[in-house]
Amino acid sequence: MQKLLIEGGHTLEGTVSISGAKNSAVALIPAAILADSAVVIDNLPVISDVDLLAELLREIGGDVDLGNQTMTIHPEKMVAMPLPNGRVKKLRASYYLMGAMLGKFKKAVIGLPGGCNLGPRPIDQHIKGFEALGAQVTNEQGAIYLRANELRGAKIYLDVVSVGATINIMLAAVRAKGRTIIENAAKEPEIIDVATLLTSMGAKIKGAGTNVIRIDGVDHLQGCRHSIIPDRIEAGTYMIMAAAMGRRVHIDNVIPTHLESVTAKLREMGTTVEEYDDQLIISGMDPKKGVDIKTLVYPGFPTDLQQPFTSLLTSAEGTSIVTDTIYDARFKHVDELRRMGASVKVEGRSSIVNGKSSLQGAKVKASDLRAGAALVIAGLMAEGITEVSGLEHIDRGYEHLETKLTRLGAKVWREELTEEELEQVKQS
């Protein structure tokens, strides 16, 4: 196991190129199960979640060739192999295997997923959708069992706007009989990306990206080639890093309209943001003005950038309030920021950040993916050396993080954990 070391205080300057979207990739790969011939996915991020999904598709009989940012999936020999345990539990997004396998085989057994532990992230809306389509769903010994004689289109109203449920119902409905209407659907760009892949395969989907999605079921889906959209969360993370420590940072391979909420908040703080067709240029400015953040479903401020933005706010003037309306337990980074000298406290669903903290390097631990990003940003801003453990979380969602940061002028490197540190990890 490794840790990431960051020598703080170095100015960032230069160009960073954004990878394909993690939150698309983890849905697009299971979607390939639905096809009857080969699916090729380009612009894949090189992250551990993608490797895990490739292994899971192989487990159910798929022939998967994973090259440099490209995956070719041959689904012809896939079977409805039960996956109650093992790798499936390491991955939050393994729940997309439910919708895809239900759509293709009319049955699935999937172990309840893991990934980031952000408090209760129930899949009740997914289950509601599957049942509306005609599936029987039971939870037996920590695995979800899905069975259906046939799937029939239905009108499904989501009680909570959920990206996962919207995509999962789409996956199950594209080969169902008749029309499915998803109301109060999520509108995230990743949903449009999945719908684009499915449409290329022959699915009939209208309204992806709006709050009402209509799907007319088809009997067969053929393979296709699809390129993933850029990762707006990775892009937002580098925007925040550039605002914190950047002189002039070019962020390439982005879709600026996907990041309007982040751009607006950075400008409110005094950061200069220049927008072009597929590029953003960020110039950090001092003094930074404190701002309040409230996470909302897209196109609001993304919950995935709440933790990284909190690190930036420790250097701003005045008091800032960060409220997460999506996940109420997404504040595990706060204790670690406090270790570094930040003045932050949690009250309910909000963290209150008293700015102008002078951060000091410390030993900190990433408890989840975006907490990891927050600690890296804090390390870039801090005086001295910060050691971040829990790198397995960061590697789930950020491709070649230290390589990209080094190119921008940061001093970042990996080291193996000492035996003493390994013992501490085991005990925790």
Swiss-Prot record:
Active site: 116
Subcellular location: Cytoplasm
Gene that this polypeptide is encoded by: murA2
Recorded catalytic activity of this chain's protein: phosphoenolpyruvate + UDP-N-acetyl-alpha-D-glucosamine = UDP-N-acetyl-3-O-(1-carboxyvinyl)-alpha-D-glucosamine + phosphate
Record-given protein name: UDP-N-acetylglucosamine 1-carboxyvinyltransferase 2
Function statement: Cell wall formation. Adds enolpyruvyl to UDP-N-acetylglucosamine.
Enzyme Commission number(s): 2.5.1.7
Database matches in InterPro entries: Enolpyruvate_Tfrase_dom, Enolpyruvate_Tfrase_sf, MurA_subfamily, RNA3'P_cycl/enolpyr_Trfase_a/b, UDP_GlcNAc_COvinyl_MurA
Functional pathway: Cell wall biogenesis; peptidoglycan biosynthesis
Record GO terms (molecular function): UDP-N-acetylglucosamine 1-carboxyvinyltransferase activity
Binding residues for UDP-N-acetyl-alpha-D-glucosamine: 92, 121-125, 304, 326
Modified residues (2-(S-cysteinyl)pyruvic acid O-phosphothioketal): 116
Family in the record: Belongs to the EPSP synthase family. MurA subfamily.
GO terms for biological process, alphabetical: cell division; cell wall organization; peptidoglycan biosynthetic process; regulation of cell shape; UDP-N-acetylgalactosamine biosynthetic process
NCBIfam families membership: murA, PRK09369.1, PRK12830.1
